[in-house]
Amino acid sequence: EFTTITPLAREVEVDDDAPRMHVAEAVASGGLFDVELVGNVLEVRDGSGLIERCPDCGRVLQNGQCRVHGDIDGEDDMRVKAIVDDGTGTVTVILDRELTEDLYGGTMEDAMAAARDAMDKEVVADEIRETVVGHEFRVRGNLSVDDYGASVEASEFERSTEDPAARATALLTEVRP
């Protein structure tokens, strides 16, 4: 009842492209909605691949335990937590089930079958590591910065098609006086 809405006298441009930024610039902003970063995957963190989530709160279970709900039967899921570095800084990129399945090259059911055959859930994360570590990727998503560092909840994650030498030259041009 105390809100007033006033129409703008101008048109607002809608842009489907996310702004591309260097990691350091994006992190310094404190958080961004819909940003694009390009960098090399340095590591795929533990807790990637096949995971279990609490059916009540969605948190990832650790040894069958939810931090909030205790001992609980989890629901199967997949994710990737990757460290991406562009030379100016690093960010943790979190891929949901759909993006993880795309990266893995199969469904969660395929991944679970591979883990059963190997009798080891880590085979899925290991295969993803072999695919991405050391390669340059373009990531788009929402960036948040907190006490644990910077993270991006990815909406897109794909191998970069840019010339790495040209990107390196452009970066050096920006940072050299």
Regions found by a protein language model. Give the residues of each.
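Single-stranded nucleic acid-binding proteins centered on OB/S1-type folds
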Residues: E1-P177
